[in-house]
């Protein structure tokens, strides 16, 4: 079957933003205008099409990023052919940053939504950082221009100040708050208005109001200057006072946006149906198609030092990245993939190159909001959900078995909070195991383990809301009732001293014995190394090289159990430099045990210390309650980093240990008569004070 839309007309984009910037409403409008959804869904009444999980509709926040396929010919049908959008709606709540990270990994471009009133909020900074990390070209859409206190140019200034990027507006707002009427298009130098009759479907173009002409000229000049910097030829033309044509300006802005040099900005009000069609036009005009970005890099599964790449081309070998796993009540597991190269037909066999396992693709579906269309094939650039995958986890590569490749792996953050869950009845016990297993497969930032001493099931995640929602899903989707314990902080441990330790494991008991012997030099790891930094300095074969991986494994396993209070040990450098072996009795197991024994001795010799997670906390409060809020943060061992004035009140930024933040939502509400709000996310690990370390060690026994 031939390709229906050429790959140059694909746009794989994400709509990302802070929790209340109006992202889901914007996605809804995208669906409405692209003709896929004929009745607009409103988040307010819990009917939004992309928010398909019950909890999302109740809480009015988006948890799972639904991938939706839609088509667009332009707000004024100005494109000769239809463009195909794959839109990923991502959550903006801090506890779900993992979802945003997974989506950004597979996108070619992003629309970052800001609220016209609140501007840059804490989560916007996180999302911006993640987009920088993956080099995602983006557009800024300042939404909610109809809200009290909305100001487009002020938000542009905040982005410059707090995110370190100077956006280039290609529109200006006409009016604001209740008087917001539309936009000035700085490319065509026309005013654009919207009709309620067609729900803001087709822009109405008129001359620019006289009182805004001077401002429009100034910002058009700013835009033209940004375009002229694309190359020397345009720069010379501009400096010599020649007019650049609109075609030249557009091409130059597109080139610079895709290169990540500039970020273009537009404005509107999704809720009031003023401006989303122009956002869609801007996506086509300025964000990349899969063929406009560099080929994706990967490695050879058999030899990680060999770098491979795949271009967005149907003729190349098939390769795709699984970026999301979802459980569907009707068809079982859906594996969402982004296809980077080649073609895959339903029924084809592929290999999961990370695990080295073969998989057969049963059926394939494409999502249109929450309807789904069964398709027979996917090609380079497509995003689709595969049904029938047996053992695929987020971040793994599916590819052609003859030409295997491992696409770049994703790094997932370690959880910072844990709670014990106990099934209410015997019947719930079995179901709980299955439910937790499925949820952990869907979400790599969620971990499940059994406490060996108490036999309790411990679940860990990225925040209280994260765990609340998973327990809620367990109840609804799997009918498992459970009791939840008090939240526990996930501490870490590290050593502070350098030391050399001998690990020796010798056992003689009739027949074949065990013999493993190694000397390891332990030290804190180099800057930026979170896990184990393992170095082999054994010379002269005193420890045969086939036993070296077993030594590494022994150290890693003991690190998981810690050496101070039973928490994982991080940032450890271990250099194996000497040892001995026995021709008959030595084996991998013996060396693993020897290394584990050596690591255990760090408790006495390594100057171990306990680390506690520190959260970046941002509280927005009316000025009247500022003193109380700050005093309370100080009592919680918080460090105030600074504050600033915003339309919504004073913003206090602080770093506070997670252990002091449980129940903060209730406390901050009662302190401010319900008027303050806060957000927090994990920032770093710091040495825990002695009294905390002592309490924790006692508790761990």
Curated annotation (Swiss-Prot):
Q: Which residues form the tr-type G domain?
A: 8-291
Question: Which domain of life does the UniProt lineage start with?
Answer: Bacteria
Pfam families tied to this protein:
EFG_C, EFG_III, EFG_IV, GTP_EFTU, GTP_EFTU_D2
**Which terms in the GO cellular component ontology are assigned?**
cytoplasm
Q: Where in the cell is it found?
A: Cytoplasm
Q: Which Gene Ontology MF annotations are present?
A: GTP binding; GTPase activity; guanosine tetraphosphate binding; translation elongation factor activity
- Gene Ontology biological process terms in this record: ribosome disassembly
Q: Does the keyword Protein biosynthesis apply?
A: yes
Main site of residence?
cytoplasm
Q: Which positions does UniProt annotate for GTP binding?
A: 17-24, 89-93, 143-146
**Which Gene3D superfamilies does the record associate with it?**
3.30.230.10, 3.30.70.240, Elongation Factor G (Translational Gtpase), domain 3, P-loop containing nucleotide triphosphate hydrolases, Translation factors
Q: Which residues cross the membrane?
A: none
Coiled-coil blocks: none
- Give the record's keywords alphabetically: Cytoplasm, Elongation factor, GTP-binding, Nucleotide-binding, Protein biosynthesis
Read off the InterPro entries from this record: EFG_II, EFG_III, EFG_III/V, EFG_IV, EFG_V, EFG_V-like, EFTu-like_2, G_TR_CS
Q: Which PANTHER family match?
A: RIBOSOME-RELEASING FACTOR 2, MITOCHONDRIAL (PTHR43261:SF1), TRANSLATION ELONGATION FACTOR G-RELATED (PTHR43261)
What is the similarity comment for this entry?
A: Belongs to the TRAFAC class translation factor GTPase superfamily. Classic translation factor GTPase family. EF-G/EF-2 subfamily.
Q: What does this protein do?
A: Catalyzes the GTP-dependent ribosomal translocation step during translation elongation. During this step, the ribosome changes from the pre-translocational (PRE) to the post-translocational (POST) state as the newly formed A-site-bound peptidyl-tRNA and P-site-bound deacylated tRNA move to the P and E sites, respectively. Catalyzes the coordinated movement of the two tRNA molecules, the mRNA and conformational changes in the ribosome.
Name of the protein this chain belongs to: Elongation factor G
Species name: Pseudomonas fluorescens (strain SBW25)
**Encoding gene (name):** fusA
């Amino acid at each position: 079957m031939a390709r229906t839309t050429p790959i140059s007309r694909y746009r794989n984009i994400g709509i990302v933003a802070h929790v209340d910037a109006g992202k889901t409403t914007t996605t809804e409008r995208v669906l409405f205008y692209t003709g896929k959804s004929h009745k607009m869904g409103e988040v307010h009444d819990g009917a939004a099409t992309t928010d398909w999980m019950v909890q999302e509709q109740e809480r009015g926040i988006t948890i799972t990023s639904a991938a939706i396929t839609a088509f667009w010919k332009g707000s004024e049908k100005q494109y000769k052919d239809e463009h195909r959008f794959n839109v990923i709606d991502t959550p903006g709540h801090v506890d779900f940053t993992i979802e945003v990270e997974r989506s950004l990994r597979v996108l070619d471009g992003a629309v970052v939504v800001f609220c016209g009133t609140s501007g840059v909020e804490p989560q916007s900074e996180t999302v911006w950082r993640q987009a920088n990390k993956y080099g995602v070209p983006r557009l800024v859409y300042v939404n909610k221009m109809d809200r009290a206190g909305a100001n487009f140019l002020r938000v542009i200034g905040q982005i410059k100040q707090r995110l370190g990027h100077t956006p280039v507006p290609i529109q200006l707002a006409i009016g604001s708050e209740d008087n917001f009427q539309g936009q000035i298009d700085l490319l065509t130098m026309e005013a654009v208005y919207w009709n309620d009759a067609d729900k803001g479907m087709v822009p109405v173009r008129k001359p620019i109001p006289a009182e805004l002409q001077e401002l429009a000229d100034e910002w058009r000049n700013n835009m033209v200057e940004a375009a002229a910097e694309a190359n020397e030829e345009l720069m010379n033309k501009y400096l010599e006072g020649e007019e650049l044509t609109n075609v030249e300006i557009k091409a130059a802005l597109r080139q610079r946006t895709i290169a990540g040099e500039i970020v273009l900005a537009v404005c509107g009000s999704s809720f009031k149906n003023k401006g989303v069609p122009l956002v869609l036009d801007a996506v086509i005009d300025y964000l990349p198609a899969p063929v406009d970005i560099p080929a994706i890099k990967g490695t050879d599964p058999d030899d990680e030092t060999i770098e491979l790449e795949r271009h967005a081309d149907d003729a190349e070998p098939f390769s795709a990245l699984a970026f999301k796993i979802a459980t569907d009540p009707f068809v079982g597991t859906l594996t969402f993939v982004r296809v980077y190269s080649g073609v895959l037909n339903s029924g084809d066999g592929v290999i999961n190159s990370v695990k080295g396992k073969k998989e057969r693709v049963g059926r394939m579906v494409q999502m249109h909001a929450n309807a789904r269309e069964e398709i027979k094939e996917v090609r380079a650039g497509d995003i689709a959900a595969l049904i029938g995958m047996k053992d695929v986890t987020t971040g793994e590569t599916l590819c052609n078995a003859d030409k295997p490749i491992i696409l770049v792996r994703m790094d997932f953050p370690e959880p910072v909070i844990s709670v014990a869950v106990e099934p209410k009845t015997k019947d719930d016990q079995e179901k709980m195991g299955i439910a937790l297993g499925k949820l952990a497969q869907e979400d790599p930032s969620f971990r499940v383990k059994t406490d060996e001493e108490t036999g309790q099931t411990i679940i860990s995640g990225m925040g209280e809301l994260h765990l609340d929602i998973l327990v809620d899903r367990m109840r609804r989707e799997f009918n498992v009732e459970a009791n939840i314990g008090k939240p526990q902080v996930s501490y870490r441990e590290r050593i502070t001293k350098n030391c050399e330790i001998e690990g020796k494991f010798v056992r003689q008991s009739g027949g074949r014995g065990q013999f493993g012997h190694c000397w390891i030099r332990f030290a804190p790891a180099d800057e930026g190394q979170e896990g184990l930094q393992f170095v082999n300095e054994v010379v002269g074969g005193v420890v045969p090289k086939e036993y070296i991986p077993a030594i590494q494994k022994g150290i890693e396993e003991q690190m998981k159990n810690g050496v101070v209070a039973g928490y994982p040990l991080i940032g450890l450098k271990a250099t194996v430099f000497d040892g001995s072996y026995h021709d008959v009795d030595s084996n991998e197991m013996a060396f693993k045990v020897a290394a584990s024994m050596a690591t255990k001795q760090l408790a006495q010799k390594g100057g171990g210390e306990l680390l506690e997670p520190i959260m970046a906390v941002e509280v927005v409060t009316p000025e009247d309650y500022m003193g109380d809020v700050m005093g309370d943060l100080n009592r919680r061992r918080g460090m105030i980093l600074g504050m600033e004035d915003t339309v919504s009140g004073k913003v206090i930024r602080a770093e506070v240990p997670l252990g002091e933040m449980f129940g903060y939502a209730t406390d901050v509400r009662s302190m401010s008569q319900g008027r303050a709000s806060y957000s927090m996310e994990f920032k770093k690990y710091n040495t825990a004070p002695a009294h905390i370390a002592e309490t924790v060690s006692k508790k761990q026994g």
